Amino acid sequence: MAKHERGLRFQPAGGVKTVQIPAGKKQRLTIERLSDDGRGIAFLEGKTWFVAGSLAGEEVEARVLNARGKVVEARTERVFTASAMRRAPACEYFGRCGGCSVQHVPHEEQLALKQRMLAEQLLRVANVVPDEWAAPLSGAELAYRRRARVAVRWDAKAKRLDVGFRAAASQDIVSIEHCPVLVQALQPIMNELPGMLKSFSKPQVLGHVELFSGVATAVLLRHTASLVEADLALLQAFCSRHGAQLWLHGEGEPQPASPGDTLGYRLEPWNLQLAWRPGDFIQVNASVNTAMIEQALQWLAPAKDERVMDLFCGLGNFALPLAGLARDVVAVEGVATMVERAAVNAMSNDLHNVRFFQADLSQPLTQADWAAEGFSAVLLDPPRDGAFEVVRQIRKTGARRLLYVSCNPATLARDAVELIRQGYRLKRAGILDMFPQTAHVEAMALFEMSK
């Protein structure tokens, strides 16, 4: 009996344990197709590989970044057989920096990928196709980003200051001295920033840096302890040379080094200027933001005698232009400080037919007085989680038209199911190319109450 027992193989409950592939391992793969996020998909020995930097039909060597169960995440290290679609990336850091994921894909193909992602989500989740597909709303491929956070970390062991952007799927910092997606006003600042910070006498106190471009250019430094005078003088001279405001973020809220300095951006078609502060949300792509507002107003088409509700209104990015067309605008935002700034923005732009309210829009709206007033149209611009609680009650507002601006096609499709159940019809939809060179999809959808 014992002789036979030695030949038996016992396995724990749950089946055979999957052998994990170690990070760093290189593997030759044939890419079958692209995933929704722009990565190549390959299949090998029962595992599905998601390979950044690859294209359908290519044969590549991929380095494993992470493996879990039957899913392997990897990065292209070498291309043996290239797709005819492949192009040279505009940035030398592409493939290492985590900021851009599809620079190797022509822009028209990037737009087609995003359009397909939106269409597939709407069809699969909501079983709906819009009555009309709008052309993609896009702008410049490069030099579009007016805001960026630069990672800074002191390596005490190596006595080295790392300055750059986070690596893909990692907390590592890729040292970077230029970034082609930044607007031109920020390019020379980014070029010289690493060298300037590395000359600090006390680099240990440095946190991240934020760069802003708008009505004014600004540099914000997060620091964990007080700056010594020599380092502060170095920073002030750097900002002065680049014509930039300096903001410091130690304890408490960020503050300008020169009292009275403010940040803001223009919406030229409506002769509006919106003030904001570090920490506030603004769209990073100024030209596509303007085009997005123009398209939203065209689609929603508010009349002079209509009341419009703007939910998740932020600083008034949509509400203020809407106020120039509608009789009355009610704008609602969850962050109290942004509600305060939005109200100030309305006053400074001499708009008196828009009112701002603070509310938790993840909760039912039935208790809010402003929700019971009745509206002709509603505009939604929610975060990635979507607006499910809002759309569940949207019919109670009386709105026959609803414009949904989405930064996540999955939650847009989920919310579309509820809107269609309430009797709304998806009249028009299209993508907004807010982040060229990435697979990130923003979208706009117009729903109208069925007659």
UniProtKB/Swiss-Prot annotation:
UniProt keyword list: 4Fe-4S, Iron, Iron-sulfur, Metal-binding, Methyltransferase, rRNA processing, S-adenosyl-L-methionine, Transferase
Q: Which HAMAP family match?
A: 23SrRNA_methyltr_RlmD (MF_01010)
Q: SUPFAM superfamilies from the xrefs? A: Nucleic acid-binding proteins (SSF50249), S-adenosyl-L-methionine-dependent methyltransferases (SSF53335)
Q: Which stretches make up the TRAM domain?
A: 20-78
* Catalyzed chemical reaction(s): uridine(1939) in 23S rRNA + S-adenosyl-L-methionine = 5-methyluridine(1939) in 23S rRNA + S-adenosyl-L-homocysteine + H(+)
Q: Does the keyword Cell wall biogenesis/degradation apply?
A: no
Q: Which family does it belong to?
A: Belongs to the class I-like SAM-binding methyltransferase superfamily. RNA M5U methyltransferase family. RlmD subfamily.
**Enzyme Commission number(s) of this protein:** 2.1.1.190
The organism is: Pseudomonas syringae pv. syringae (strain B728a)
Biological processes, Gene Ontology terms: rRNA base methylation
Q: What is the protein name given in its UniProt record?
A: 23S rRNA (uracil(1939)-C(5))-methyltransferase RlmD
Query: Is the keyword Methyltransferase in the record?
Result: yes
One Gene Ontology molecular-function label: rRNA (uridine-C5-)-methyltransferase activity
Q: Where is the active site?
A: 407
Q: Which InterPro entries match?
A: 23S_rRNA_MeTrfase_RlmD, MeTrfase_TrmA_AS, MeTrfase_TrmA_CS, NA-bd_OB-fold, SAM-dependent_MTases_sf, TRAM_dom, U5_MeTrfase_fam
Q: What does this protein do?
A: Catalyzes the formation of 5-methyl-uridine at position 1939 (m5U1939) in 23S rRNA.
Where is [4Fe-4S] cluster annotated to bind?
91, 97, 100, 179
Kindly list the positions annotated as binding S-adenosyl-L-methionine: 283, 312, 317, 333, 360, 381
Question: CDD domains under this entry?
Answer: AdoMet_MTases
